[in-house]
């Protein structure tokens, strides 16, 4: 029986191995044929369906299961270039299927390279918002369901630790810039050295000033030898942006570049000129008139979204209201987008967080309550409706001061909007209702104040001052339309007024003052002010510094330091001898001897003779080769003892630099005109100097970047090594043998006789390594008897000799 079973098993194993080899061979043949089809792909041909492209069977099955069969224009042109491995800049209208244009090449390129979990991260997709990243990830799951790749979603608002545990096993990642950079800096086992493809969805938004530093930091972690795909409805062509992404000869694919309009053809676009204080009235009237439709209302700030949502929710317009802004938690944002997508009739108040890429089904209206910052933002906002050849309508609310500038910006982008007027009989005023609610609810009033400030700030920071002019807006009336008792104070507006007053010319101020004086002369003269009562506190504050001598004393002092003649002063006293010069000495030893000799003489004639003696010159000390110091007082004599104080009397030194040969030169040497002309034309010298300096700074910049990159790499490696050591220590601690608690029955069995090994021989007890083990308790006699019986029973079962010895013992 045994040989026959072995023969059957061996035959079955051989057949299974043979079928496995055939399957692998068939897969390799399909793969090689697929690679050949991609190499022979014609980039100029126009493809209509996914089956016409060289796509693998798993991808084609996923597309068919998700009901994707026909190619759009952007998909037909971009996928063929991406399959060839070229960098692509894709630009197409909103709702034209740009997501599949980069997801299909990702799956195909990784499939052709037989990517597995051991190869690490193969593709990275960066999205500007969390909602768009979730949407891309869901599409990737649908069309990639038959592949074996592992895909992950990395966005803010989720647990960082859970993402770190799974990140090292991912092949495809969909992420937002901030969270991706956090993982690149902090996650130890996350490597990107083997990355094959980088995709930036809504690339113009990702590469603007808001994400510039983050994107630059992410690019620094990625290998330069990769394929890069950029997609957006308004694509960038700036050389600086393309150089930052290390694009190599990119293919610019703009399928609607020659179209008459940059927006979908079935989109009806209108604008309404309504003053700022009447915007909320117009919006409320519009919502009440369209209760059986699905609408998105865009505003410029999250505070406005919250205020309009809370106030309209209290007034109950008769349609479900939702609000979406960046300050909400991720769970709430996801719940709101899901509810709005599934709703048949609803109104969503949102900021620009929902303006790009999000695919809400069957949106009827897009209302822009606030003027967009530029034409690109307008195009992305209205792109939430009229998607996939469906009908849609968009309305833009404009203040009279914004109309001219915004229409000019839209014309430059080939966007045509028609003006419509609001029917007066349909418009309802909600000003009194808002005032009543703000009076009763302080929180709503505070929210309204914040909404007012955030709107004014959003207008103030705009660069396009032709369209956004804060001075032409009626802010007081706008505050009243929000239900506020008055316009809140805004610091930056007050600062502008102060700056204007400060920068006003003196001539204007002089003319103004002159006009005021002339008016006063023409009219009645000003009456003198009545004498006010001056208290002791007023006199105290009017006091001058006590250590400063009065003015009348300064009149007594001549310029040379001598006391002025009393005859020349108006306040001369009759006592002329009250202030008189006693003696005056000059510095020096001779003057001191003269003092001693004059002190011995007491006659008036001797003192007069000394006063008229010829004065000697003061001492002159040579400090340096060029500088000298006159010693004419004792204070000057003390200066000679301090080198630090003498420095201010010395001249400034000259700084010398030494060339390679050791010769000294001044720091700045003037060149002759002839020598300058001998070196060529001035413009040529300037251009040559700029080129040399640019090359030098570029080399230095590259060296600095390489050093910084090396430091970051070393720091990351140290952190990873430290984390590996911690993990290894934790594993060692888990593998350490634990002490087993004492068991009476087991110890009794050991003490009751013997323990028998599998060979039937007694094993010597191993010495215990424990420091201290408690002594076992005394075993009762009935347990000993039970142990002996058990031992006897175990011995009886083993061999025939044991059975005979047991019977002999019982009989005897």
From Swiss-Prot:
Q: Where in the cell is it found?
A: Nucleus, Nucleolus
Which reaction does this chain catalyze? ATP + H2O = ADP + phosphate + H(+)
What's a single GO CC term here? small-subunit processome
Question: Which GO terms fall under biological process for this protein?
Answer: rRNA processing
Q: Where is this region: Disordered?
A: 1-28, 503-538, 560-626, 687-797
**Bias (Basic residues) ranges:** 8-26, 710-719
In this chain, composition skew of type Basic and acidic residues spans: 521-538, 579-596, 610-626, 687-709, 720-736, 763-794
What EC number(s) does its UniProt record assign?
3.6.4.13
Provide the protein name: ATP-dependent RNA helicase dbp4
Name the species this protein comes from.
Emericella nidulans (strain FGSC A4 / ATCC 38163 / CBS 112.46 / NRRL 194 / M139) (Aspergillus nidulans)
| Source species taxonomy | Eukaryota, Fungi, Dikarya, Ascomycota, Pezizomycotina
């Amino acid at each position: 029986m045994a040989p026959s079973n072995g023969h059957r098993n061996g035959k079955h194993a051989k057949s299974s191995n043979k079928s496995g080899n055939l399957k692998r061979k068939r897969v390799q043949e399909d793969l090689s044929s697929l690679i050949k089809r991609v190499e022979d792909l014609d980039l100029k041909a126009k493809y209509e369906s996914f089956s016409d492209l060289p796509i693998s069977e798993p991808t084609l099955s996923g597309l068919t299961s998700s009901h994707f069969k026909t190619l759009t224009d952007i998909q037909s042109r971009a996928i063929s270039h991406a399959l060839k491995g070229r960098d692509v800049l894709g630009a197409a209208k909103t709702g034209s299927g740009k997501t599949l244009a980069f997801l299909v090449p990702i799956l195909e390129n990784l499939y052709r390279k037989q990517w597995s979990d051991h190869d690490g991260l193969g593709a990275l997709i960066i999205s500007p918002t969390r909602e768009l990243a979730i949407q891309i990830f869901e599409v990737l799951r649908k069309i990639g369901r038959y592949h074996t790749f592992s895909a992950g979603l990395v966005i803010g608002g989720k647990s960082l630790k859970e993402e770190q545990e799974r990140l090292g096993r991912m092949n495809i990642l969909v992420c937002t810039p901030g969270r991706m950079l956090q993982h690149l800096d902090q996650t130890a086992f996350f490597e990107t050295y083997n990355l094959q493809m980088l995709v930036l969805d809504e690339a113009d938004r990702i590469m603007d000033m808001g994400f510039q530093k983050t994107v630059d930091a992410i690019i620094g972690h990625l290998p330069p030898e990769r394929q890069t795909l950029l997609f957006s409805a308004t694509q960038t062509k700036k050389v600086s942006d393309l150089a930052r992404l290390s694009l190599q000869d990119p293919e610019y694919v703009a399928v609607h570049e020659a179209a008459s309009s940059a927006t979908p053809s079935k989109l009806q676009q209108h604008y309404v000129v309504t003053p700022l204080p009447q915007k909320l009235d117009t919006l409320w009237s519009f919502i009440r008139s369209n209760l059986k439709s699905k609408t998105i209302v865009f505003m410029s700030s999250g505070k406005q979204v919250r205020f309009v949502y809370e106030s309209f929710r209290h007034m109950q317009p008769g349609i479900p209201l939702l609000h979406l802004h960046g300050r909400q938690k991720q769970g709430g944002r996801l719940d709101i987008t899901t509810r709005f997508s599934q709703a048949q009739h609803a109104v969503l108040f949102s900021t620009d967080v929902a303006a790009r890429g999000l695919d809400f089904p069957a949106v009827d209206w897009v209302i822009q309550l606030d003027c967009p910052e530029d034409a690109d933002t307008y195009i992305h906002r209205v792109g939430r409706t009229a998607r996939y050849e469906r009908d849609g309508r968009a309305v833009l609310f404009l203040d009279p001061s914004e109309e001219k500038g915004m229409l000019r910006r839209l014309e430059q982008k080939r966007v045509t909007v028609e003006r419509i007027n609001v029917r007066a009989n349909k418009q309802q005023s909600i000003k009194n209702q808002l005032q009543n609610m703000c009076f009763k609810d302080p929180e709503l009033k505070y929210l309204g104040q914040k909404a007012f400030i955030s709107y004014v700030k959003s207008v103030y920071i705009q660069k396009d001052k032709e369209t956004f002019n804060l001075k032409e807006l009626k802010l007081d009336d706008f505050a009243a339309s929000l239900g506020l008792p008055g316009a809140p104070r805004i610091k930056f507006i007050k600062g502008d007024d102060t700056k204007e007053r400060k920068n006003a010319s003196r001539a204007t101020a002089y003319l103004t003052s002159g006009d005021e004086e002339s008016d006063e002369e023409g009219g009645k003269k000003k009456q003198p002010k009545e004498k006010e009562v001056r208290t002791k506190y007023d006199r105290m504050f009017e006091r001058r510094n006590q250590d400063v001598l009065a003015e009348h004393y300064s009149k007594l002092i001549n310029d040379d330091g001598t006391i002025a003649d009393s005859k020349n002063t108006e306040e001369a006293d009759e006592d002329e001898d009250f202030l008189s010069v006693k003696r005056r000495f000059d510095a020096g030893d001779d003057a001191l001897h003269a003092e001693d000799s004059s002190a011995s003489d007491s006659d008036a004639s001797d003192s007069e003779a000394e006063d008229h003696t010829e004065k000697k010159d003061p001492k002159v000390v040579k400090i340096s080769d060029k500088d000298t110091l006159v010693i004419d007082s004792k204070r000057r004599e003390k200066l000679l003892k301090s080198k630090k104080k003498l420095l201010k009397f010395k001249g400034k030194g000259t700084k010398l630099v030494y060339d390679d040969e050791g010769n000294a030169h001044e720091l700045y040497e003037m060149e002759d005109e002839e020598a300058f002309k001998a070196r060529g034309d001035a413009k040529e010298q300037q251009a040559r100097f700029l080129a040399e300096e640019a090359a030098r700074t570029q080399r230095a910049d590259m060296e600095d970047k390489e050093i910084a990159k090396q430091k970051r790499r070393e720091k990351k490696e140290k952190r990873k090594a430290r984390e590996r050591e911690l993990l290894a220590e934790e594993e060692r601690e888990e593998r350490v043998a634990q002490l087993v608690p004492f068991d009476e029955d087991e110890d009794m069995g050991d003490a009751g006789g013997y323990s028998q090994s599998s060979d039937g021989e007694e094993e010597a007890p191993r010495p215990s390594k424990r420091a201290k083990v408690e002594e076992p308790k005394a075993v009762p006699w009935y347990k000993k008897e039970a142990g002996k019986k058990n031992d006897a029973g175990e011995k009886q079962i083993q061999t025939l000799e044991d059975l005979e010895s047991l019977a002999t013992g019982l009989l005897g």
